[in-house]
């Protein structure tokens, strides 16, 4: 399952993304975030983190720095209160 998800992200990055203008509100981009999340936390947890990230990547969210967490917690809030926490 992990390889299927990573293959989908790779396809998006190489085929679809170059045809679109850059619109991601975050750094790293959502596709890079998804790739790292799945590699670091596996298909289920990484897929969950990626889905949460994609739901936040919309015009009503300010975006900013949002790195894949080192540890995974199902109960973690959907968004950290202080994006500067990522810069530590």
UniProtKB/Swiss-Prot annotation:
The keyword Cell inner membrane does not apply. It comes from the Bacteria. One of its GO terms (cellular component) is plasma membrane. Keywords: Cell membrane, Membrane. It is found in: Cell membrane. It holds the Pfam family YidD. It is a peripheral membrane protein. InterPro entries: Membr_insert_effic_factor_YidD. The keyword Chaperone does not apply. Belongs to the UPF0161 family. Could be involved in insertion of integral membrane proteins into the membrane. NCBIfam families: membrane protein insertion efficiency factor YidD. This is Putative membrane protein insertion efficiency factor. It comes from Exiguobacterium sibiricum (strain DSM 17290 / CCUG 55495 / CIP 109462 / JCM 13490 / 255-15). The lineage of its organism: Bacteria, Bacillati, Bacillota, Bacilli, Bacillales.
